[in-house]
Amino acid sequence: LAPPINLPKWLKDNASLLQPPINNYCVYDKDMTVMIVGGPNARTDYHINETPEWFYQYRGAMLLKVVVDGAGFRDVVIHEGSFFLLPPGVPHNPVRFANTVGIVIELPRPAGSVDRLRWYCTACEGGVVVHEAAFHCTHLGSQIKAAVQDFAADEEKRTCHKCLRLADAAPAPGSIPDPNLEPGDELRVKEE
């Protein structure tokens, strides 16, 4: 039986473990995967998981970019103190901003399940897929990071077959509006 985790103390003692591009650390990975995730992250992929994912924002707001069948691309803002249950099979890109912290809970992957990371062309209409990586996820903390780094290092994988534009491996600084900022205001999320 694992001891309880005091989240503020854990963050103070282990902030260095939350590193780009994913910024996550698995604190439990037996019956469920429980991750502490910090910001900012640096990823442009959309993760597709065959099981649901539960997001809770402990500090600051995050943006969950999703692709919904029939509705296209949508943004879901998850504010500090709020949680959100993402259904299985929904492509999603978790965007985390500076000084934010959340918790994500996932179920163990069933035998034969396949996780996918998908990159879309931002220049083409209609959700043109630039590249998709597929794998059976056995270690969330390392496999997603490896796939993101592999995409970033390979211009062929990053080239859109339709418009030949090179897809970004990381968002351009300031390209995604931070819900923690108000125009002209200071950052509302405080460092602890």
Identify the residue ranges that each predicted region occupies.
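Jelly-roll (double-stranded beta-helix
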Residues: L1-Q57, A61-F83, P91-E192
